[in-house]
Regions:
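Single conserved hydrophobic/aromatic residue that forms the stacking wall/gate
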Residues: 1-12
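Glycine-rich phosphate-binding loop
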Residues: 46-84
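Short, ordered loop/turn segments at secondary-structure junctions
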Residues: 34-36, 63-64, 85-88, 112-113
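N-terminal beta-loop-helix "entrance" segment that forms/cooperates
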Residues: 31-52
Length: 165
């Protein structure tokens, strides 16, 4: 299974957490910079060719007007996960632009700067029918649980005069 990750600007910084997760899960992926406004022909070529190239999920990060995610979704049947980027208006403009798509053009949307959750959601989509990937994802989520258990164990050792636990 292949996954594409697209966005403008410092793509690596914006998508680093998703990229690290995909790498950990041994899922081949690519990272590119595209703009719905500055490189519309390239966006169209990518979106219209994604399915034929074997792309199963697209992660698109965008800020401000955040049209990239919706433009890609309008040109493909491949699921698109939108990552709103905090650039102006604390990222609320991007969040609303991505989440408020017209009927028939869905974009799965994660939180502002939520590249890690976009990666996890993409892995969950790719894991449908793939037991090996499901097992990797289950182990990843179990590790998340262990981190919380460990944090609680460490907090139990912290002492304050009025702390009750």
């Amino acid at each position: 299974d292949r996954l594409r990750s697209r966005g403008l600007g410092d793509v690596y910084k914006r998508q680093e957490k998703a990229a690290k997760l995909l790498d950990e899960m041994e899922i081949p992926f690519e990272m590119h910079a595209l703009s719905a406004h500055r490189t519309p022909a390239e966006v169209e070529a990518f979106a219209k060719g994604a399915k034929g190239r074997g792309i199963k999920v697209i992660i698109a990060a965008a800020g401000m007007a955040a049209h990239l995610c919706g433009v890609i979704a309008s040109m493909t049947t491949v699921p698109v996960i939108g990552v709103p980027i905090n650039s102006t208006l604390d990222g609320m403009d991007a969040l609303l632009a991505i989440v408020q798509m017209p009927p028939g053009i869905p974009v799965a949307t994660v939180g502002i700067n939520g590249a890690l959750n976009a990666g996890i959601l993409a892995v969950q989509m790719l894991a449908v029918g793939d037991e090996q990937l499901q097992d990797k994802l289950a182990a990843y989520k179990e590790d998340l649980k262990k981190k919380i258990v460990k944090a609680n164990e460490e907090l139990a050792k912290v002492s304050f005069k009025y702390k009750m636990n």
